[in-house]
Each structure stands twice: as C-alpha cells, then as structure tokens.
Amino acid sequence: MVDITDIDSIRKFVIDNNIKIIVNCAAYTNVDKAEEDYDTALEINYGGVCNLTDVCREFGIYLIHISTDYVFNGRSNRPYKTSSECDPIDSYGTTKRLGECYALEYEKAIVIRTSWLYSEYGKNFYTTMINRIIERKETNVVCDQVGSPTYARDLAEFIIFLIEKQDEEDIEAHTGLYHFTNNGCCSWYDFAASIEQLRKSKGRNDFIKPCKTSEYPTKAERPQYSVLDKTDLYEFPYEPRHWLAALRHCMMNDNKIKEH
C-alpha cells in the first residue's frame, strides 16, 4: 500500500514497478468528520493528489483521479455539466475540488467525478441498508436529496475502458474532466426502498421510512440535487446502465443476501 501523502513513497513505487498509469481512488470520504478534521481531509484530498500529480508529471505517466458530485452546491434543478460552476458547501467537497483542480493542470490527467458510490463490499450506504433490513430495524432515510447511485463495479469497468484505449489510440486525446454515474436519478429514500423491495424478504417489507433533511441534522451540509450530466461520455461512445439494473447486479453478487 502506498501513502499518497508521502511523495517519496509514491516515487519509489512508480520506479520499482515501472508504473505507466496511476488510478487514484484514495480519499478522505467521511463527509461529517471532515468538518472537524479539515486538516487531515485537506492533506489527503488535496496534498495527496498534488503528490500523485507531481510524480506523474515527473515520469510522464497518466493519472486517473476520482472526484465527487460534492464539488457542486446542489441548488440547481438540472444535471450538472463538466463545465458547470463549482461551489462546494462542505469541507469534504472543498478539499476534493482543490485536488481535482491541481490534477487538471497536468496534461496527462483524467478526472472522473462520480456520485453515491456503493458496492456489496466494505462500508457504504448500500451495505448499511442491507444490514439494517436484515436486522429488521426501522431506518429513516432522507427523501429530499437527489442524485445518481453508482455501482463501483461499473465505475471500475469505465476506468478499465479508458486504460485500454491506450492500446487502440492515444489516451491523451481523452484526458480532462468527465462525469460518470449510473443513468437515472433518485432520492436516498428511493435508493434504500429499492434495496428493500428487491431483496423480497418474507414478511414485513416496510422498515425504510422517508424523512426530510431537516429531520436528520448532520454536521456537514449536503447538496440537495447533485445529478451529473454525462453527455461527454458519448464521444467514446460509452453509456452507463440504469442505476436500478446496476443495483440488481450488485444484489445478485451479494453473498450476505444469499445467506439471509
């Protein structure tokens, strides 16, 4: 494992392994904790990205960096384009914006903004909801924040698609900023309710309850609407599947569901 806050560690890893492309998925992602631990979030989300970018520039290698929908304020009512003005409203979004700006100054960098990332592994919204449903615990989920869930497998496949382009054509023709999420949008409540419905457990299936953001106060403010416009993907061409189709795929692969 490489510590991205240690530039010497990155440089050594690149030299020892003859790296040609770096894909940076590392980030400080605890949105609420970032409000009180801003320095650490900044060190990772900005300082770490600066280190990666500088090493990539030093060796002339490509950088693919993952960013977030939280660079927007969420006050729009239409999908945000890559050209839309950024205005983060929390510390997490602010540090991620600083990082992506630095990366985009490098001509061999690709920055991919994504949103509501989940998978059947680790700790994320999906696994939290599955655990709550299996444990038959009532859960209030906000119904007035809208975005696009993104299955981590689908994001990974898009990244692989970009990397494989270097075998077909110059990847440098496709550097810059892109948005990638699964198609469609929903509220967090819709997402959670869909998980509950698709699980199709016997007996009661109403453990997920809607609530307003005002009823669920958090330390960090979150965008009310953060749907990302993916028009730029069509130039490849590349079209992500709908978030519900991706969710079904995730749940089919989830061993925890099979066990319960």
Question: Can you describe what each PLM-predicted range is?
Answer:
Residues I4-I44:
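NAD(P)H-binding glycine-rich loop region in Rossmannoid oxidoreductase-like domains
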Residues I22-A26, L63-T68, N73, I112-T114:
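SDR active-site strand-loop-helix element
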Residues E36-I64:
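NAD(P)-cofactor binding segment of oxidoreductase domains
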Residues E43, G48-N51, V71-I112, W116-S119:
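Catalytic helix-loop patch of NAD(P)-dependent Rossmann-fold dehydrogenases
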Residues C101-S148, A152-F161:
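NAD(P)-dependent short-chain dehydrogenase/reductase
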Residues K165-K219, K258-H260:
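Mid/C-terminal beta-alpha module of Rossmann-like enzyme folds, strongest
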Residues E221-H260:
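C-terminal amphipathic/interface module of NAD(P)-dependent oxidoreductases
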